[in-house]
Amino acid sequence: MLKTISGTLALSLIIAASVHQAQAATTYNAVVSKSSSDGKTFKTIADAIASAPAGSTPFVILIKNGVYNERLTITRNNLHLKGESRNGAVIAAATAAGTLKSDGSKWGTAGSSTITISAKDFSAQSLTIRNDFDFPANQAKSDSDSSKIKDTQAVALYVTKSGDRAYFKDVSLVGYQDTLYVSGGRSFFSDCRISGTVDFIFGDGTALFNNCDLVSRYRADVKSGNVSGYLTAPSTNINQKYGLVITNSRVIRESDSVPAKSYGLGRPWHPTTTFSDGRYADPNAIGQTVFLNTSMDNHIYGWDKMSGKDKNGNTIWFNPEDSRFFEYKSYGAGATVSKDRRQLTDAQAAEYTQSKVLGDWTPTLP
């Protein structure tokens, strides 16, 4: 018996030592901490990014727990942010599209972003990215209040057309209107949590979401029986095969205060675009959102329409049936099969595997 116990103890010590060695073997090119004063650790993420050498070799930054009030633009390829924990390592800013710059101009939707990705092969893991613009407080103001911001889009994460192969693992994105803007390349979101109200996942990029929570937030400014928001607003070009693809995920409510049938799965965004014959809603933005094997709470009612401007400046409507909006094996209180919620066949659903959506890119972490 003693021999067996000794052997078990020895094995346990070997395993513990192996785990310790594996952790010690994890190397970071830079470490960020709000509390360290050893002279080797950066106090801001921006300073850590600036320390990365030119080139495109992998550069990995460990972000210790803390709230970092920073706005970041990533332009270096192969940069990787690793948080100490998803809820503990927080990058936050509070800028809305209507927030004024020092010169009096507005930041605009894209300019409101807390983090902007304009590089290839970026990754973020185990951290939170927030846009802390106080949407509820702003909406509670009187329309006659000069401090009330009219353009309330407030992006937490923006992947630009210069971005490609952006990988987000165990990341929380927090905002209200326009939380996540994917405008270019390919992005992969795995085990993530994305919360918002109006069009909180939008854009014309290709983005695959797997095992994610899409969280609809409560709005005190919306009267009972009215629509509170929309999960997606894709503007995918007609020649692009994939847009926003959500698989094996959960469409949930922030709390029971979110009413039943108050959120749409998506609406078609045709962004106002300048053409040779004028400026009007892009007719080629035949947006795609597809939900596969995803559970839906009862706050979901289906798809919706969205307005735009024609060549003469008149309001026109774009209907969901004219877009690429589909579901496959949705389930839960918010799932239903009807003519207004088109379903994929098994053969069609087979076209939405990770390898097909992301092509020649297999997401990996450093």
Curated annotation (Swiss-Prot):
User: Disulfide pairs?
Assistant: C192-C212
Effect listed in the UniProt record for changing R267A:
Loss of activity
Taking the first listed entry, what is the main subcellular location of this protein, grouped into a coarse class? Answer: secreted
Q: In which pathway does it act?
A: Glycan metabolism; pectin degradation; 2-dehydro-3-deoxy-D-gluconate from pectin: step 1/5
Tell me what happens on changing M306A.
Strong decrease in catalytic activity. Decreases affinity for substrate
Signal peptide (UniProt feature, chain positions): 1-24
| Subunit structure, interactors included | Monomer.
Q: Which PANTHER family match?
A: ACYL-COA THIOESTER HYDROLASE YBHC-RELATED, PECTINESTERASE 53-RELATED
The entry's protein name is Pectinesterase A
State the species of origin. Answer: Dickeya dadantii (strain 3937) (Erwinia chrysanthemi (strain 3937))
Q: What phylogenetic lineage does the species belong to?
A: Bacteria, Pseudomonadati, Pseudomonadota, Gammaproteobacteria, Enterobacterales
